[in-house]
Amino acid sequence: MYLGVVVNPLARKNRGAPLDRSADLRRIVGTWGEVHETGSVDDLGAVVGRLYPRASHLVSDGGDGALNWLINEMHSRVADPLRWPTFVPTNGGTIGFVARKARVRGRAPAILRALTAAAEADRPPTEVWLDTLELKGETTDGATFHRIGFALAAGGVGNRFFDKYYENDDPGRATIARVIARAIGDYAAFGVIPGSNRPNYAAHLFTPTRARVVIDGEEVPTRTHRALHAGAFDVNLGGFLRLFPRASEPGALHFQAGDVSPGGIIAHLPALVAGRAIRGDRLRDINGDEMIIEVDDEPLSPIIDGERFDGIVRLVVHAGPRIRIAQVGSSTAA
């Protein structure tokens, strides 16, 4: 085992860490790995180039999008996912759904102590294979768009939720509850008035995305989408919302596309908390192999694993490569 630790000191939950955080992590890892800092995603290429192929495990210590960027940098360098290192999220983001799914416990120092002990004992931690989404498309300037990810909020409520979520300086589980509570209160007080110029929290959140959507060759019978999402596995968002229950079994993708009224969305909140599928006459909430999204007017700004990408006019979503995640549990990350 050899550990490659990639630290983003600018991530929200790392900003308050001691100035010598990376030095502390290097002391934990010792001779069993390397710790590198990135000032931006532009630094990832050089860092991964130094770590691969020596590193058997790539540890992502950053914010919500850090693991996604690390996986995609590896994907851009090595086509065969079987040759990729094992990835390790460190619960450094605000939503942490990949770590929850893989049952990774603890923060970066505890996780690195467990991994270093495993390396010293020559007993690598157990691993779990997670499904991914592969997203291919086109931008407004005609460029090719290509990403690997686990969860997609291409438009509608799921996408606009993150606008409100990231307005908070320190978002987390409580922020999710506050966004939902304010949207419900605003909708109850004022409703959603089409074309109104009055600022309205609920109106922004419930504004639909206009697009032509085709799932497995069948067009969704509406161009108005308040739900436009995809998941490679069931997601526990901040320990509060349980999304994409139809993707709970390996190999099953969960697609959501279509329209649900704001009142219908609010009525379905208990189902989202409990991890149940949602229903609607103009909604497709199903398993599938491929979803194609073509915008009608405004480009998409999809959220992929908590990271926003602007200016997408066409997006094709299907199964991506399976990825190995090391399971560092509470019994070892202490």
Q: What is the role of each PLM region?
A:
Residues V5, I215-T222, A232, G238-A334:
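ATP/nucleoside-binding phosphotransfer catalytic cores, i.e., glycine-rich phosphate-binding loops
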Residues G16, W69-I71, V98-R100, G239-F240:
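Short glycine-/acidic-enriched loop or helix-start segments at secondary-structure transitions
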Residues R50-R54, A143-F145, V220-R223, D285-N287:
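Flexible, charged surface loops at secondary-structure boundaries
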Residues T38, P81-T224:
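Catalytic core of DAGKc-family lipid kinases
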Residues M1-D61, G65-N68, N72-R77, L82, ...:
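ATP/NTP phosphate-donor binding region
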Residues R12-G16, R160, N236-G239:
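Short N-terminal binding/cap micro-motifs at the start of the first secondary-structure element
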